Amino acid sequence: MNKTFNYSTMKVGIIGGGQLGKIMAQKAKKMGFHVTILDPTPNCPAAQVSDKQIIGGFHDPEKLAQLVNENDVTTFELEHVDTSILKKMFDEGKNIYPSPYLIELIQDKYKQKELLDKKGIPVPAYKKVDTKACLESFGFPVIQKARKGGYDGKGVILLKTKDDLSKAIEAESFIEELVDIQKEIAVMVARNIEGEISCYPVVEMLFDERVNICDIVIAPARIEESLRKEIEDISIKCIEALDGVGIFGVELFLTKD
């Protein structure tokens, strides 16, 4: 990946204009890219540091197509996007990374977990919820996760006992065994269209348990070197299994055993 590029004439479109989009846009501008943001909120955070904003929703095919057509490459701040028009344009040769087909897969946490499981990635025991009775398959306590739409702790619930079934998620979901966690770990993985891949430093996440949102990130993670290498290997295997192109955050549980 040690290559030099001239980005001075390249145009990048980013779907999503929140804080992550802003960070991405700031770095892109320093590298010389022309940056356009698609977001429904006028003067959103990312637009404040970019060259242009297209005001439109993430499910608006016309605005999505406009962004792709006006830029050399299009990428994503978030996965909650209508992929229909993007898949069509990707098939026509437009540079959209990660692939909208991968974004569509990532949108469904159950399908994502199923694929990683089939590729030999270690995952907690899980089961699709087809009926209320399925919620009791693993006993209690158990984790229930919405298949789609979850973020920042939303779409995830801990069912401690059978009495909690009245609070269960009504949308399409799956259950997952409750893991005895020592640490929550994350690593950013970058992979290009040639398949070259590299990892950022492994970090440790501390969560605010009241709202289940990451509150503190410790870099580098307080772990042994041998464990760091294993985490990197698993993370790389995940992105290769997805045939991902772009920068991905891989989150892992370090169990007590």
Residue ranges of each PLM-predicted region?
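Structural motif corresponding to alpha-helix initiation and N-cap regions
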Residues: G57-P61, T83, T131-K132, K162, ...
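A conserved helix-loop-beta module that forms one wall/lid of the active-site cleft
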Residues: P98-G155, K162
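Short amphipathic alpha-helix with an adjacent loop that forms part of the alpha/beta core around
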Residues: P61-E70, A133-F138, S166
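ATP-binding N-terminal substructure of ATP-dependent carboxylate-amine bond-forming enzymes
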Residues: M1-L102, I106-Q107
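Internal nucleotide-binding/catalytic subdomain
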Residues: G155-K256
